[in-house]
Amino acid sequence: MRLILLGAPGAGKGTQAEYLSKRFSIPHISTGDILRENVKNETELGKKAKEYMDKGLLVPDEIVIEIVKDRLSKEDCKNGFLLDGFPRTIAQAEALDKVLEELGQKIDKVLNIEVPDEKILERMSGRRICKNCGASFHVIYRPPQKEGVCDVCGGELYQREDDKEETVKKRLEVYHAQTQPLIDYYKAKGLLVVAYGQEEIADTTKEVLKALGIE
């Protein structure tokens, strides 16, 4: 099975990607991870990418695509893979089609995990992290026994910048603007399937399997 996984930040994409990777014995390929790996291992592509990253610039498509191509040509991708974080644009999607054609492969399905924005906002802006031990809490779903204090070590709980309401709203706006054309692109190709994210992880997994036609 060759899958592309779409989903807004906070939609629970990472958890489902891990599950699907284990269930189907296919590698979970996160573009962020393979980019960092190439930089760390000082590969030719990694060195090129690092020049941009060091300047705080986005790594150009042609480098990202080469890195993805290199990863997809590895032995463990022969029977399938799960792509997460790529493609992000129509240009990248078209480039991916070409890469797969060269490798004699094609995408089976594009899975979009949909969660209403207000639900994501509640999930993310309610998160609190312990400054001392890193334990995670949630003001609604997993509140600490004493407000602002970690149950584990008694450390102070704080809200990460990334989880502040305004930041989350901005990230969601950017995500929708960027991803909608991609959703339309794969819908037109008849590859798009949708799973509706639920409160419980296990219920989302059921939705995901149903969307993929696996009960």
Swiss-Prot record:
Subunit structure: Monomer.
Organism: Caldicellulosiruptor bescii (strain ATCC BAA-1888 / DSM 6725 / KCTC 15123 / Z-1320) (Anaerocellum thermophilum)
Binding-site residues for AMP, renumbered to this chain: T31, R36, L57, L58, V59, G85, F86, P87, R88, Q92, R160, R171
Protein name, UniProt field: Adenylate kinase
Catalyzed reactions per annotation: AMP + ATP = 2 ADP
Keyword terms of this UniProt record: ATP-binding, Cytoplasm, Kinase, Metal-binding, Nucleotide biosynthesis, Nucleotide-binding, Transferase, Zinc
Enzyme Commission number(s) of this protein: 2.7.4.3
Similarity annotation: Belongs to the adenylate kinase family.
Region described as NMP: spans on this chain: 30-59
Subcellular localization, as worded in the UniProt entry: Cytoplasm
PANTHER family: NUCLEOTIDE KINASE (PTHR23359)
Molecular functions (GO terms): adenylate kinase activity; ATP binding; zinc ion binding
Stored Pfam families: ADK (PF00406), ADK_lid (PF05191)
Residues annotated for Zn(2+) binding in this entry: C130, C133, C150, C153
One annotated Gene Ontology cellular component of this protein: cytoplasm
Domain comment, as recorded: Consists of three domains, a large central CORE domain and two small peripheral domains, NMPbind and LID, which undergo movements during catalysis. The LID domain closes over the site of phosphoryl transfer upon ATP binding. Assembling and dissambling the active center during each catalytic cycle provides an effective means to prevent ATP hydrolysis. Some bacteria have evolved a zinc-coordinating structure that stabilizes the LID domain.
Intrachain disulfide bonds: none
GO biological process: AMP salvage
Binding residues annotated for ATP, in chain numbering: G10, A11, G12, K13, G14, T15, R127, S136, F137, Q198
Pathway in which the depicted protein is active: Purine metabolism; AMP biosynthesis via salvage pathway; AMP from ADP: step 1/1
Main function: Catalyzes the reversible transfer of the terminal phosphate group between ATP and AMP. Plays an important role in cellular energy homeostasis and in adenine nucleotide metabolism.
Region (LID): 126-163
Main subcellular location of this protein, as a coarse class: cytoplasm
